Amino acid sequence: MSSRVVDLARWRDPRLGQPREVELPAGTVRYHDQGSGPVIVFVHGYLVNANLWRKLVPLLADRFRCITPDLPLGAHTEPMRRDADLTPVGIAQLISDLLDALDLREVTLFGNDSGGAYSQLVAADHRERLGRLVLSSCETPESSWPPTPGGFGLLKVTAAHPLSCLALYQVLRLRRSWRWHNTYGWLARRPIEPTVMGSYVRPVLERPEIRHDGRKAIGAVSARYTRRAAERLTAGFDRPVLLAWAAEDRVFPLAHAERYAWALGAELRAIPDSYTYIAEDQPELTAALLRDWRQS
């Protein structure tokens, strides 16, 4: 039984490419590298991992080099160093360190959910290797972080203590809970297959060191980080920016994206029949949108 748990925690869809590892100042980061061409680095949010992009990468890998890291946000397999900075500033630094370590240039940084919040910090403070920025159904200056819709603020509250954090996550052992609005039900419009969900929830349920990383990360988030980043971006970010937004998003309202796109001078495209995880709900539309935008 335990070996099966390990398999579920470490399983990544083979369409992402072979898993690789890179040593960064914060610790070892596992990532996948698939395709060739202009580089897209995909940044996921809390309690998911590279599997979020499993449907999208094979639709892009014929024309783009797709880098999909597992960030230390609770669904990863390699624990960070105990003293690693996993505040929003620290996660942004980790992403920047990843781009440096892989010597990636003119990167399109694609952030979804709280990955979009971290991507804004990267663009504000570490833009040297960026060529373009895609923000997809994520925090804006009007959002709280964690977002209030869906009750995700409870994640930060319970992160204050290891036992409260452990107790909160126990409900994820029940498959029916995965469709609740305060777990994944308002993030993916349709159910996610159990193997993928196992890779999302098993690490934080079974491994205290992974739960420790997740607690550090979610316990440190605050809207003050995204608002400061937004101020810097609206004041002068000279790369193309796209907001790719789920038209029916329950967590990050499309109206927020409309106002943020105007402030950034960015293009906004709405994706129908999708919640926050557009790469999960609408991979074909998302791939077509990216291809078209890159050609414009």
Predicted regions and their residues:
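Conserved acidic functional residues
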Residues: G45, D113, E280-D281
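Generic recognition of short, well-ordered alpha-helical segments
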Residues: N51, K55, P146, A255, ...
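Flexible "cap/lid" subdomain of the alpha/beta-hydrolase fold that forms the substrate-access gate
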Residues: S3-Q18, G27-V29, I67, G74-E106, ...
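Conserved HGGG/HGGXW glycine-rich cap/lid loop of the alpha/beta-hydrolase fold
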Residues: R30-E78
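Conserved beta-strand termini and adjacent loop/short-helix elements that scaffold enzyme active sites
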Residues: P25, Q34, P69, I271-D273
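Catalytic histidine-centered segment of alpha/beta-hydrolase-like enzymes
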Residues: S274-A287
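Short, flexible hinge/linker loops that cap or flank conserved catalytic cores
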Residues: E23-P25, D33-G35, I40, A235-G236
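Residue-level signal for the nucleotide or nucleotide-sugar donor/cofactor binding architecture
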Residues: V48, K55, L86, G90, ...
